From Swiss-Prot:
Protein's GO biological process: L-leucine biosynthetic process
Organism lineage string: Bacteria, Pseudomonadati, Pseudomonadota, Alphaproteobacteria, Hyphomicrobiales
Transit peptide among keywords: no
Gene name, Swiss-Prot/TrEMBL: leuD
Organism whose genome encodes this protein: Methylorubrum extorquens (strain ATCC 14718 / DSM 1338 / JCM 2805 / NCIMB 9133 / AM1) (Methylobacterium extorquens)
EC number(s) reported in the record: 4.2.1.33
Catalytic activity field: (2R,3S)-3-isopropylmalate = (2S)-2-isopropylmalate
Cross-referenced Gene3D superfamilies: Aconitase, domain 4 (3.20.19.10)
GO molecular function, a single term: 3-isopropylmalate dehydratase activity
Family in the record: Belongs to the LeuD family. LeuD type 1 subfamily.
Protein name per the record: 3-isopropylmalate dehydratase small subunit
Length: 201
């Protein structure tokens, strides 16, 4: 899993509440267990017209936001069914950070397991971030995980809270398997060294 340290760039604003996992990645894309290729289905019912052409008014189809790595979204993002394909699709599209006032618990945890930083802020701070994001290509956000800060285009800084374990895993690029190996590495090394001394075993 890719480490998350500092992320700088344009943030795409989506002033929509209760975006559920069905809207993040519709059911027709759930037939695969591969984590790659799902980016094309991200928000597909909002991104594309019935004929497959892009819906020009959708934020991620607009030139300023087409390559955004951060989303600023409405309350209760990721609600609905507990499909892990939702963070897979976000990650495959290139999204590394999602900021809102609240997230569904399962989605929130799945984000961290897939290298996505989900940040919870106050309604007042979210409004500031929406206003910054809506300025388009001329305004960037800088998210510093180690410092737990979001710096706006005019230099203003917001602080966010995060669980220390989640922070450690994201900073070091550790998913569940990586975390297990990281924690058990000394014991594994000791066991292998002991085996090496017992050539007859």
């Amino acid at each position: 899993m890719e480490k998350f340290t500092t992320l700088e760039g344009v943030a795409a604003p989506m002033r929509i509440i209760n975006i559920d996992t069905d809207r993040i990645i519709p059911k027709q894309y759930l037939k695969t267990i591969k984590r790659t290729g799902l980016g094309q289905g991200l928000f597909s019912e909002m991104r594309y017209n019935d004929d497959g052409s892009e819906y020009p008014d959708f934020v991620l189809n607009q030139p300023a936001y087409r390559h955004a790595k951060t989303l600023v979204v409405g309350d209760n993002f990721g609600c609905g069914s507990s499909r892990e394909h939702a963070p897979w699709a976000l990650a495959d599209f290139g999204i590394r950070c999602v900021i809102s006032t609240s997230f569904a618990d399962i989605f929130f945890n799945n984000c961290a397991k897939n290298g996505i930083l989900a940040i919870v802020v106050s309604p007042e701070d979210l409004e500031k971030l929406f206003q910054d994001a809506e300025r388009g290509a001329n305004a960037t956000l800088t998210i510093d995980l180690a410092a737990q800060t979001i710096k706006g285009p005019d230099g203003g800084t917001l602080h966010f809270d995060i669980d220390e374990g989640r922070k450690h895993n994201l900073l070091n690029g550790l998913d569940e398997i990586g975390l297990t190996l990281d924690q058990k590495a000394p014991a594994i090394d000791a066991y292998e060294a002991k085996l090496a001394q017992r050539e007859w075993a």
